[in-house]
A protein has these predicted regions:
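Short amphipathic helix-loop junctions that connect adjacent transmembrane helices
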Residues: 137-156
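Helix-to-loop junctions at the C-terminal end of transmembrane segments
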Residues: 170-183, 267
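C-terminal membrane-cytosol helix-exit motif in multi-pass small-molecule transporters
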Residues: 81-101, 286-292
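Cytoplasmic helix-loop-helix junction between adjacent transmembrane helices
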Residues: 5-44
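Helix-loop-helix hairpin linking two adjacent transmembrane segments in secondary transporters
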Residues: 40-92
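Hydrophobic core of transmembrane alpha-helices in multi-pass small-molecule transporters
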Residues: 1-15, 209-223
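Juxtamembrane intracellular "pre-TM" segments in multi-pass secondary transporters
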Residues: 96-122
Length: 296
């Protein structure tokens, strides 16, 4: 039953983000696309921060008064279900459906997985694979690097991942909101931040520099993520930009599947190898972006 519930939860979660991104693409103009995707990304990161805090506050609490042994462990899941129900109601009531009605004589263009979109998806896979790789080894890296016990490891990992999410929110609500240029430039701006963050982590003599390295990676991700989704939508025609975003959202799924798998293999060889491994990926990113710009 637990396995089935996790499958259902993952299926809903995997569908909600592409659908939300596609909606943002459909209701924003080309000039507002990066800004809209930045707000969308910031909302996701706020949830990333508040979710663990909410779970920690609710676990063990039997706020429903049920006479069931260990029912308090299920409280976060019940509250999550209620929140999702409220979100669904909010969507149906308050979000306008601005779907364009096409005449029967006007053929609707279909989203095509052309060379440009293939390059874009490749860019997304690299970005999210590298990010997922770092996320998945953070706890192990902290524990092995500083010889922390389990409690200190959990607390420090929460601080680092929370800082990454917070810095992503900062860049998405400040830099991205004011930026009006090409979305690909946001990805290019993020690459030096990614490279710098990896070097800071690899050569950090203490926890402080490691902390700033993770924060810098969060800033980079706050630029790269909306830049990627905006570029994907602007790659399509006006009547299928939402579909393009939905298709482009396959990249985070692949990245968060491949990243943790690679991290285990690399980390078993050396604790710094995952960070060394992703450095060439960022240079590959530069090459792909350059090819995409030549096509455009």
């Amino acid at each position: 039953q637990l396995l089935i519930s996790r499958i259902i939860n993952s299926a809903i979660g995997a569908a909600s983000r592409p659908a939300s991104g596609a909606y943002v693409a459909d209701v924003t103009s080309e000039e507002e696309r990066s800004s809209g995707m930045g707000k969308f990304g910031a909302a996701n990161n706020i949830g990333t921060i508040l979710g663990p805090v909410l779970v920690g506050s609710l676990v063990g609490l039997n706020i429903f008064g049920a006479q069931i042994p260990q029912f308090g462990l299920l409280t976060p899941l019940i509250v999550m279900s209620l929140i999702m129900t409220l979100a669904a109601i909010f969507v149906f009531i308050y979000l306008p459906n601005n779907k364009t009605v096409l005449s029967s004589e006007e053929p609707r263009s279909k989203i095509v997985l052309d060379t440009r979109l293939k390059y874009l998806i490749s860019i997304g896979i690299i970005i999210f694979t590298a990010f997922a790789l770092v996320q998945s080894i953070t706890a192990f890296y902290i524990q092995d690097r500083f010889n922390y016990d389990l409690d200190n490891t959990a607390q420090t990992t929460a601080i680092l991942l929370g800082t990454m999410a917070l810095m992503a929110i900062v860049s998405q609500l400040t830099i991205v909101q004011r930026y009006k240029g090409s979305p690909l430039n946001l990805i290019k701006f993020s690459i030096p931040l990614f490279i710098t963050s990896c070097l800071m982590i690899i050569f950090s003599p203490n926890f402080l520099l490691l902390f700033f390295g993770m924060a810098t990676m969060g800033l980079g991700m706050g630029l790269a993520s909306p830049g990627y989704t905006s570029a994907a939508s602007l790659n399509a025609n006006s009547d299928n930009q939402g579909a393009a975003v939905g298709l482009a959202m396959v990249a985070p799924g692949i990245g968060f599947a491949v990243g943790p798998f690679l991290s285990g293999i690399l980390y078993s060889t050396s604790m710094n190898l995952p960070f060394i491994f992703i450095l060439p990926l960022y240079f590959l990113l530069i090459i792909i972006i350059r090819k995409l710009e030549l096509i455009n």
